[in-house]
Amino acid sequence: MKSRLGVNVDHIATLRNARGEGHPDPISYARQVMNFGANSITIHLREDRRHIRDEDVAIFSKIKRVPINLEMAANNEMLKIALKYKPNFVCIVPEKRNEITTEGGLNITKNKKIIKKVISKLNSKKIRTSLFINPNIKDVFASKELNAKCVELHTGKFALKVKNNKNYLVEFKKIKKCALLAKKLGMEVHAGHGLDYKSVSYTHLRAHET
């Protein structure tokens, strides 16, 4: 399958909120990246609303041109919002209030009960669910057990090692191994966090060599 690009516009909203005005507008920027060929748009509604807000989710939910991927924590408040606006995808992510951005994958074992509940509710409304996980085999199997339709593999360590010209092959092999397993188990595979032109081009060049 051909690779697809999803673009996260959260930090356009961060700039807007810092200015205290209506611009820059994440909706306008989303339209621009769609014009340039993006295959989907990602927004993260955090519990503290530090960038994307509820009203943004309402507007993005009306976009039909490309799929909308809503990132959110696994809790009842966010579940209610997702069921109201029905995005194409929901990616369940961990959240810490003191983090600048999402720092790692879900602790599925610790949060299994609430994650299972959220996935079940979303699946019943035909909203495709994804779990944001670290690239390890255990979490791929756990995601399948919870009936997630997709996994998003955390690429942060890989991207950082590429940026610093360190030994990134080990991290790449972890991601590839998990991606192949998830696909074999019937799940769609997404990958994200910290990727840029250099790290993405590396994955393309090395995909058939390792």
Regions found by a protein language model. Name each.
Residues E47-F60, N76-M78, E99-K117, K138-D139, ...:
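Active-site-adjacent beta->alpha loops and helix N-cap segments on the catalytic face
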Residues T203-T210:
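Conserved small/polar residues in nucleotide/adenosyl-binding loops
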Residues M1-I68, N75, L83-K86:
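Conserved N-terminal beta1-alpha1 strand-loop-helix module at the mouth
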Residues D25-S40, L83-E95, I137-K157:
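Alpha/beta enzyme core
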Residues I92-L146:
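Hydrophobic, well-structured mid-protein blocks that either form specific transmembrane helices
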Residues I68-I108:
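Glycine/small-residue-rich loop that forms an oxyanion/phosphate-binding "nest" at active or ligand-binding sites
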Residues D10-I12, R46-D48, E71-N75, E95-R97, ...:
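Active-site beta-loop-alpha junctions enriched in small/polar residues
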Residues L5-V9, I41-I43, I68-L70, V90-I92, ...:
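Hydrophobic faces of well-ordered beta-strands that scaffold small-molecule active sites
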